[in-house]
Curated annotation (Swiss-Prot):
One of the primary rRNA binding proteins, it binds directly to 16S rRNA where it helps nucleate assembly of the platform of the 30S subunit by binding and bridging several RNA helices of the 16S rRNA. Forms an intersubunit bridge (bridge B4) with the 23S rRNA of the 50S subunit in the ribosome. This is Small ribosomal subunit protein uS15. PROSITE patterns: RIBOSOMAL_S15 (PS00362). It comes from Petrotoga mobilis (strain DSM 10674 / SJ95). GO terms for cellular component: cytosolic small ribosomal subunit. It comes from the Bacteria. InterPro entries: Ribosomal_uS15, Ribosomal_uS15_bac-type, uS15_NS1_RNA-bd_sf. Keywords: Ribonucleoprotein, Ribosomal protein, RNA-binding, rRNA-binding. CDD domains: Ribosomal_S15p_S13e (cd00353). One of its GO terms (biological process) is translation.
Length: 91
């Protein structure tokens, strides 16, 4: 199993969620990338349930994504709903 996201998948996510052509760091893109990393790490932990170091990293990523989504919900509610639906995560 590889570490993190492969560059093609990352580029694909950036293309889908970017606001303009040069956008790579907007909240929308960051949430999408974090969600992909969280999904990848969740699959890893199903295979390796005693990998506590990775589990802690997962919890930190989930917390970071939660904070970003909270900010997005407050500042851009329509974009928040759209991202929640696209990524299939609870809001």
């Amino acid at each position: 199993m590889s570490r993190g996201l492969d560059p093609e998948k990352k580029e694909e996510l950036i293309e889908e969620f970017k606001i303009n052509d040069k956008d790579t760091g907007s909240v929308e893109v960051q949430v999408a990338l974090l969600s992909a990393r969280i999904k990848h790490l969740t699959e890893h932990l199903k295979q390796h349930p005693k990998d506590y170091h990775s589990r802690r990293g997962l919890m930190m990523m989930v917390g970071k994504r939660r904070k970003m989504l909270k900010y997005l919900r407050k500042s851009k509610p329509l974009v928040y709903q759209e991202i929640i639906n696209k990524l299939g995560i609870r809001g």
